Amino acid sequence: MKKQDHQASTKSAGLGFGAFTKKFALPLWHWYASGFLLLAAVNLVNLQIPQLAKIIINKLTTGADLSDVRGVALAIVGLGFLMIIIRSLSRIVIFWPGRRIESASKSYFFSRALRLTEAFFTSHGMGDLISRLANDIAQLRAFYAFGVLQLLNVVFLTVFAVARMASVHLLLTVCSLIPLGVMFVITRFAMPRMHTFSRENQDALGILTNRVTEAFVNVHVIQANGATASFAARAAEQNAAVLRTSLRLVYIRMFIFPLMTCLAGVSQLVVLFYGGHEVIAGRLSVGDILAFNVYIGLLTFPLSAMGIILALYQRARTALERLGDIDRAKPEGRLDPESHTAPDSASALPLLEVRRLSFRFDPGHTTSKTAPAQTPLVLDEVSFKLMPGERIGLFGSIGSGKSTLFNLITRIYEPPAGTIFWRGVDVRTLEPTQLRREIGYALQQVHLFSDSIRANIAFGLSLEPSLAELEAAAHGAQILTEIQAFGQGWETEIGERGVRLSGGQKQRLALARLLIRKPPLLLLDDVLSALDQVTEKKLLESIYARGGSLLIASHRGSALARCDRILIMESGRVADQGPFEVLVERYPSLDCAT
């Protein structure tokens, strides 16, 4: 006897910082190289200004006339304008790859998320995933754009400025840089705490986004139950948590940034005291001291920017860790590829066979009946065969396992090996997309998209359907007349989740989406609940007349009366089976539900 828990997604290696950079940033190396050259030019021009200022001061201190330094002053102004032009170009060139990385990584992680299993989405809130794909990727963009820009500025200004300072007076350079070196030690110890607080902040933001998304999706339920105030209070509480974690990061920055400025001031004091002594001794000129102070001023910005860079790096690192949950999760696919054989559509095998299927929602563990289990079995030893063209009904109360069975057949939940077979082949060896193309599954909860009626019916088709195909599908779902009555017909926008349609129209539109695909098997999970008796009767006549195999679950006997046989589901087991006429005598509830 085979038992299976609902399995958690297994992990594979995800994108680390280096791998992410190689995948998304390295292909844009020519943009970064161009930005590198432009920033080098900016900083070289910038470092000429102190030298020109030194010339002006030295000339003026030796009694030169203003006319003697006019040309040098104009050169400084010209270099300033040149810096504006080159710096603007450098920002454009370096920021552009950041946007490209943002766009490419959003597409990558979104595409990756769409291929993940139901287990992943069960353990992650929709709002939290939206936050990861929006806010966290925005943090990566900030680092690979503004962060890279500032990092290059730091490297160039530090190397060039220190080289110029050392060429003037090596010992004074060493003494003036000691206070700035202290800052690197302080930031090194601050980095782990910044990373921890960044993770807490981005996790809290993900929870808040999830709360807000849930509220907007279920706003009618919240209002109908008078829970507006309590939901708002919960959101406010989580918003306060985001604020608290944000303030922790702010406190660290409030400590680091002023300290950087203060230490830069200490460096300038060192230059004034020690440099002044050297001027008095005749080993340095006044112009040299001025140039030194300008260089220290130039170094103040990149060292202050180090705090920004560290903050951006920590937030980007945290973002990549959170996105790594998406990247590491195992996508849908063949679970047993080594035993894969192609389904035989021409054989006399059952179209669908379920063999002693047992299942419980308990990720990561396989238990037997005698072993202690965290959750009860949802399905217990379910077995049946569905032949091509056969129509089977599932009758049972809520919680009897009908929907879970359908989710296992379509591999929304992963079934145990050797329990579900499609055309004689274990479904675990099939690609989920291949399997689902042959099975039309209408879920209890209708899912429509904010688009036109045409787009919703044609959803999932590789080719644009003809008008005749659309009309045939809509007619089969008993909604053609209503579509034609809409002002814009097939192009009518139905709003988010089909808000402009009634409950019955939503169900029939979703059914038309299945019928246009003409799958060999239809799985209908209580899809008639919002229909009146007349529409239900017409729709059932259309479904039974289409041919093909049918597996329909309902708590209304009228929907199952025409099935070849009915399985009675009780507490996850097949309690009985047979034709409607036989079972109705043993189960009066089947007749009462007609």
Model-identified regions with their sequence ranges:
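Hydrophobic alpha-helical segments in the permease module
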Residues: 75-87, 180-184, 253-267, 273, ...
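Transmembrane helices of ABC transporter permease
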Residues: 27-41, 149-200, 271-284
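An intracellular "coupling" helix at the cytosolic face of ABC transporter transmembrane type-1 domains
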Residues: 22, 26-27, 118-119, 135-144, ...
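Membrane-integrated ABC transporters
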Residues: 1-46, 61-76, 90-94, 98, ...
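ABC-family ATPase nucleotide-binding domain "signature/switch" substructure
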Residues: 437-440, 445, 456, 473-477, ...
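ABC ATPase nucleotide-binding domain helical subdomain, centered on the C-loop/LSGGQ "ABC signature"
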Residues: 107, 325, 349, 421, ...
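Helix-to-loop junction immediately C-terminal to a conserved catalytic motif
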Residues: 410
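Cytosolic ends of transmembrane helices, especially the final helix of ABC transmembrane type-1 domains
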Residues: 204, 227, 251, 299-328
